[in-house]
């Protein structure tokens, strides 16, 4: 994201979304922090299934083209970039299941998945760029929280794509096991069809009982 001024009013600025770039990473390298990993999660909002986190260290000489916040990409584009990222980057994935989510809350479960994803990288990073307002605790390196990081940092964007595609595939498999809920279609989100299925069949082991409307007062 960068600011540009119109020629006739240089004091007024328009926000222009140019997509993520490698500026955070290169600035960190100038300061002696290298390599840099990006981390992000997928699945904080659904009523069912895990929250999945990924950590990615990109090869600066071989960065896949077209990366962005995974939510802005088509499924086909995400799948294509997933393959490219896996082939060119150092990648680690971790997840927190419904039990942990219900036990400690979704934010802590998400940050813990990020922490484990970072610790699982084959090469330890000198700096971690984490999407959002919070830094994952318990990692043995510097960390920086980047608000809307998946739209600003290519490393975080890559992590968002890996996390999203991984979680979607997990929920597709869950739909084969738990056939009454349609997980393969809505990935656990609270769609009308999913809510009707819960009403008809009750919750299953994948449901987050601390989330409304599953939570009982």
Swiss-Prot record:
TM region(s), chain numbering: none
One GO term of the biological process aspect: DNA replication, removal of RNA primer
Entry's EC annotation: 3.1.26.4
Disulfide bridge map: none
Binding site for a divalent metal cation: 40-41, 131
Cofactor(s) it depends on: Mn(2+); Mg(2+)
Pfam families per the UniProt record, alphabetical: RNase_HII
Function according to Swiss-Prot or TrEMBL: Endonuclease that specifically degrades the RNA of RNA-DNA hybrids.
Keyword Repeat on entry: no
Gene3D superfamilies cross-referenced by the UniProt entry: Ribonuclease H-like superfamily/Ribonuclease H
Enzyme class label: hydrolase
Localization annotation: Cytoplasm
HAMAP family in UniProt: RNase_HII_B
Designated name of the protein: Ribonuclease HII
Note on how the cofactor is bound: Manganese or magnesium. Binds 1 divalent metal ion per monomer in the absence of substrate. May bind a second metal ion after substrate binding.
């Amino acid at each position: 994201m960068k600011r540009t001024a119109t020629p006739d009013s240089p004091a007024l600025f328009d926000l222009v979304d140019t997509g993520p770039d490698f500026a955070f990473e290169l600035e960190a390298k100038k300061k002696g922090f290298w390599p840099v990993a990006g981390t992000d999660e997928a699945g904080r909002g659904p009523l069912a299934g895990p929250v999945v986190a990924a950590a990615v260290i990109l090869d600066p000489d071989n960065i896949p083209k077209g990366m962005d916040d995974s939510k802005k990409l088509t499924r086909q584009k995400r799948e294509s970039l997933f393959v490219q990222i896996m082939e060119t980057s150092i990648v680690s994935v971790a997840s927190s299941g419904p039990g942990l989510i219900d036990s400690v809350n979704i934010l802590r479960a998400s940050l813990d998945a990020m922490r484990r994803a970072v610790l699982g990288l084959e090469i330890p990073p000198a700096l971690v760029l984490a999407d959002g307002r919070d830094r994952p605790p318990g990692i043995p390196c510097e960390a920086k929280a980047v608000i809307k990081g998946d739209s600003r940092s290519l490393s975080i964007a890559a992590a968002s794509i890996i996390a999203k595609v991984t979680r979607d595939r997990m929920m597709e498999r869950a739909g084969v096991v738990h056939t009454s809920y349609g997980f393969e279609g809505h990935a656990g989100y609270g769609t009308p069809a999913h809510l009707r299925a819960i009403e008809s069949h009750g919750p299953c082991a994948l449901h987050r009982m601390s989330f409304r409307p599953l939570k009982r007062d």
